[in-house]
Amino acid sequence: MIRIVRLLQDTKEKIYMNKIYEALKNKKAFIPFITCGDPDVATTKAAILEMVKNGADLIEIGIPFSDPTAEGVVIQGANIRALAGGITTDKVFDMVVELRKEVTIPFVFMTYANVVFSYDPEKFFAKCSEVGIDGIILPDIP
Protein backbone atom coordinates (compact mmCIF):
# COMPACT_ATOMS: atom_id res chain seq x y z
CA MET A 1 0.00 0.00 0.00
CA ILE A 2 2.81 2.43 0.83
CA ARG A 3 4.35 1.78 -2.59
CA ILE A 4 1.06 2.68 -4.30
CA VAL A 5 0.82 5.93 -2.36
CA ARG A 6 4.37 6.85 -3.35
CA LEU A 7 3.63 6.15 -7.00
CA LEU A 8 0.68 8.52 -6.84
CA GLN A 9 2.78 11.35 -5.42
CA ASP A 10 4.35 12.43 -8.69
CA THR A 11 4.39 15.95 -10.06
CA LYS A 12 1.16 15.42 -11.96
CA GLU A 13 -0.85 14.53 -8.85
CA LYS A 14 -1.80 18.15 -8.16
CA ILE A 15 -2.77 18.69 -11.79
CA TYR A 16 -5.11 15.69 -11.72
CA MET A 17 -6.67 16.63 -8.40
CA ASN A 18 -7.16 20.20 -9.61
CA LYS A 19 -8.84 18.90 -12.77
CA ILE A 20 -11.25 16.82 -10.68
CA TYR A 21 -11.80 19.70 -8.26
CA GLU A 22 -12.53 22.12 -11.09
CA ALA A 23 -15.03 19.70 -12.61
CA LEU A 24 -16.92 19.31 -9.35
CA LYS A 25 -16.56 22.50 -7.31
CA ASN A 26 -19.62 24.39 -6.19
CA LYS A 27 -22.16 22.27 -8.03
CA LYS A 28 -23.95 18.98 -8.23
CA ALA A 29 -22.11 16.69 -10.58
CA PHE A 30 -23.19 14.16 -13.18
CA ILE A 31 -20.75 11.25 -12.75
CA PRO A 32 -21.78 8.22 -14.81
CA PHE A 33 -20.10 4.82 -14.59
CA ILE A 34 -19.49 2.29 -17.35
CA THR A 35 -17.78 -1.08 -17.40
CA CYS A 36 -15.33 -1.05 -20.29
CA GLY A 37 -15.87 -3.80 -22.84
CA ASP A 38 -19.52 -4.59 -22.13
CA PRO A 39 -20.58 -5.49 -24.73
CA ASP A 40 -17.40 -4.35 -26.56
CA VAL A 41 -14.87 -1.51 -26.65
CA ALA A 42 -16.49 0.29 -29.60
CA THR A 43 -19.84 0.44 -27.81
CA THR A 44 -18.16 1.57 -24.59
CA LYS A 45 -16.36 4.37 -26.42
CA ALA A 46 -19.57 5.48 -28.14
CA ALA A 47 -21.44 5.46 -24.81
CA ILE A 48 -18.73 7.57 -23.17
CA LEU A 49 -18.91 10.12 -25.99
CA GLU A 50 -22.69 10.28 -25.47
CA MET A 51 -22.16 10.80 -21.73
CA VAL A 52 -19.87 13.72 -22.52
CA LYS A 53 -22.37 15.17 -25.00
CA ASN A 54 -25.06 14.93 -22.35
CA GLY A 55 -23.13 16.86 -19.71
CA ALA A 56 -21.05 14.37 -17.73
CA ASP A 57 -18.69 16.20 -15.38
CA LEU A 58 -16.47 13.18 -14.72
CA ILE A 59 -16.71 9.58 -15.94
CA GLU A 60 -15.87 6.46 -13.96
CA ILE A 61 -14.53 3.74 -16.24
CA GLY A 62 -14.56 0.25 -14.81
CA ILE A 63 -11.66 -2.04 -15.66
CA PRO A 64 -13.23 -5.50 -15.47
CA PHE A 65 -12.14 -8.04 -12.89
CA SER A 66 -13.22 -11.66 -12.50
CA ASP A 67 -14.32 -11.31 -8.86
CA PRO A 68 -15.83 -7.82 -8.42
CA THR A 69 -16.99 -8.33 -4.83
CA ALA A 70 -17.81 -4.67 -4.15
CA GLU A 71 -20.37 -4.60 -6.97
CA GLY A 72 -24.02 -5.52 -7.26
CA VAL A 73 -25.27 -8.16 -9.67
CA VAL A 74 -25.64 -5.80 -12.64
CA ILE A 75 -22.03 -4.59 -12.61
CA GLN A 76 -20.78 -8.08 -11.72
CA GLY A 77 -22.51 -9.33 -14.87
CA ALA A 78 -21.00 -6.53 -16.94
CA ASN A 79 -17.52 -7.48 -15.69
CA ILE A 80 -18.01 -11.15 -16.57
CA ARG A 81 -19.40 -10.34 -20.04
CA ALA A 82 -16.55 -7.92 -20.77
CA LEU A 83 -13.93 -10.46 -19.75
CA ALA A 84 -15.65 -13.18 -21.79
CA GLY A 85 -15.56 -10.78 -24.75
CA GLY A 86 -11.79 -10.47 -24.48
CA ILE A 87 -11.31 -7.12 -22.73
CA THR A 88 -7.88 -6.56 -21.19
CA THR A 89 -6.37 -3.74 -19.17
CA ASP A 90 -4.26 -2.76 -22.19
CA LYS A 91 -7.39 -2.52 -24.36
CA VAL A 92 -8.93 -0.21 -21.75
CA PHE A 93 -5.81 1.97 -21.83
CA ASP A 94 -5.94 2.03 -25.66
CA MET A 95 -9.57 3.16 -25.57
CA VAL A 96 -8.69 6.00 -23.18
CA VAL A 97 -5.91 7.14 -25.55
CA GLU A 98 -8.47 7.33 -28.36
CA LEU A 99 -11.03 9.15 -26.20
CA ARG A 100 -8.48 11.69 -25.00
CA LYS A 101 -8.25 12.98 -28.58
CA GLU A 102 -11.78 14.33 -28.10
CA VAL A 103 -12.56 14.39 -24.39
CA THR A 104 -11.09 16.68 -21.72
CA ILE A 105 -13.31 15.98 -18.69
CA PRO A 106 -11.78 13.89 -15.90
CA PHE A 107 -11.68 10.10 -16.21
CA VAL A 108 -11.39 7.94 -13.11
CA PHE A 109 -10.68 4.21 -13.21
CA MET A 110 -12.66 1.92 -10.92
CA THR A 111 -11.01 -1.47 -10.55
CA TYR A 112 -9.61 -3.92 -8.05
CA ALA A 113 -6.18 -4.27 -6.46
CA ASN A 114 -5.59 -7.58 -8.22
CA VAL A 115 -5.85 -5.84 -11.60
CA VAL A 116 -3.22 -3.31 -10.52
CA PHE A 117 -0.88 -5.89 -8.98
CA SER A 118 -1.13 -8.33 -11.89
CA TYR A 119 -0.27 -5.48 -14.29
CA ASP A 120 2.55 -4.31 -11.95
CA PRO A 121 1.67 -1.30 -9.81
CA GLU A 122 4.49 0.91 -11.05
CA LYS A 123 3.67 0.21 -14.70
CA PHE A 124 -0.07 0.54 -14.07
CA PHE A 125 0.16 3.96 -12.46
CA ALA A 126 2.72 5.18 -15.01
CA LYS A 127 0.38 4.10 -17.81
CA CYS A 128 -2.56 5.84 -16.09
CA SER A 129 -0.52 9.04 -16.00
CA GLU A 130 0.58 8.61 -19.62
CA VAL A 131 -2.94 8.16 -21.02
CA GLY A 132 -4.59 10.87 -18.92
CA ILE A 133 -6.42 9.09 -16.11
CA ASP A 134 -7.26 11.60 -13.38
CA GLY A 135 -8.02 9.29 -10.48
CA ILE A 136 -8.33 5.67 -9.42
CA ILE A 137 -10.84 3.95 -7.15
CA LEU A 138 -9.75 0.63 -5.64
CA PRO A 139 -12.71 -0.46 -3.48
CA ASP A 140 -10.95 -3.51 -2.06
CA ILE A 141 -8.09 -1.53 -0.51
CA PRO A 142 -9.06 -0.02 2.84
Language-model-detected regions and their locations in the chain:
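N-terminal amphipathic alpha-helix/helix-capping segment at the start of soluble metabolic enzymes
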Residues: 15-33, 96-100
